[in-house]
């Protein structure tokens, strides 16, 4: 989300620099065209709210965790003499999407912690379309700034979201900016180059923190390379050798 009341997102006369704001979490307003959920607040309504003594009574959207306001101010915040602050593009017009958090069944499936912020890929793709449509209606170029991260996927550009971003980046007057993350030393990934001459299996240790009820891990390989795995519990119990086959599911129960 974004704190639209912050002066770094306003013009000199106090009017907003936000052309459109889609809050996917609020269902009491009018949804944007082509969508059936959330509430859209355009420039006129935001200005009405800013002129009011109680802006949130007119436009009730807020920044839940401060992340969106922080990023938007770095990218396009006005100059603030008192704090000696200036965003990268202080005269840019802004389009904002506040994503709704992922549904509980998805969080349960992927064993997402209750305190973790998590979004659905389809809502992200819907947000991209909203911003692209907004830019087209306003006749403006568009820089899509996406400061979200994930440790899932093959990281090879083949996911649906990756392909959609590629298509936006190929369009005239469209650019895509992705946050590179700040978890370089967290060791979330393991990679290995497998050759046909290998005679010994490759061992990868997964460190699970205390108090964790479970985790999800993904194994990616390139076709036609076929791999098999053996899972070894901390107590030394081993599963049989498992080959990956589409549509198959395996359940293993360890004693400890």
Would you name each region that the model predicts?
Residues 1-120, 139, 173, 212-215, ...:
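Subtilisin-like serine protease catalytic core
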Residues 10-17, 161-162, 194-196:
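Glycine-rich, phosphate-binding/catalytic loops in enzymes
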Residues 19, 239-240:
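Generic structural signal for well-ordered beta-strand positions
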Residues 29-44, 240-256:
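Exoplasmic/lumenal beta-rich domain surfaces
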Residues 103-194, 211-239, 248-249, 254-256:
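Substrate-binding/access-modulating region of protease and related hydrolase catalytic domains
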Residues 195-209:
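Non-catalytic, beta-strand-enriched accessory regions in extracellular/secretory proteins
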């Amino acid at each position: 989300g974004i704190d639209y009341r912050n002066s770094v997102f306003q013009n000199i006369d106090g009017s907003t620099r936000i052309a459109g704001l889609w809050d996917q979490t609020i269902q009491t307003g009018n949804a944007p065209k082509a969508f059936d959920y959330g509430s859209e607040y355009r420039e006129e309504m935001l200005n009405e709210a800013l002129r009011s003594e109680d802006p949130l009574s007119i436009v009730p959207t807020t920044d839940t965790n401060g992340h969106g306001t922080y990023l938007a101010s770095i990218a396009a915040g006005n100059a603030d003499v008192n704090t000696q602050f200036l965003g990268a593009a202080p005269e840019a017009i802004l389009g904002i999407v506040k994503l709704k958090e992922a549904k509980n069944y998805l969080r349960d499936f992927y064993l997402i912690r209750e305190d973790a912020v998590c979004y659905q890929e389809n809502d992200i793709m819907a947000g991209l379309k909203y911003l692209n449509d907004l830019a087209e209606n306003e006749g403006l170029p568009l820089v899509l700034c996406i400061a979200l991260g994930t440790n899932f996927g093959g990281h090879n550009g083949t996911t649906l979201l990756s392909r959609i971003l590629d298509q936006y980046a190929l369009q005239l007057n469209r650019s895509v900016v992705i946050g590179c993350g700040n978890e370089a030393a967290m060791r979330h990934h393991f990679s290995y180059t497998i050759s046909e001459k290998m005679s010994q299996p490759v061992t990868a240790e997964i460190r699970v923190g205390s108090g964790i009820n479970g985790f999800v891990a993904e194994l990616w390989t390139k076709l036609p390379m076929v791999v098999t795995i053996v899972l070894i519990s901390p107590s030394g119990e081993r599963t049989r050798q498992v080959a990956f086959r589409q549509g198959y599911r395996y359940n293993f129960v360890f004693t400890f």
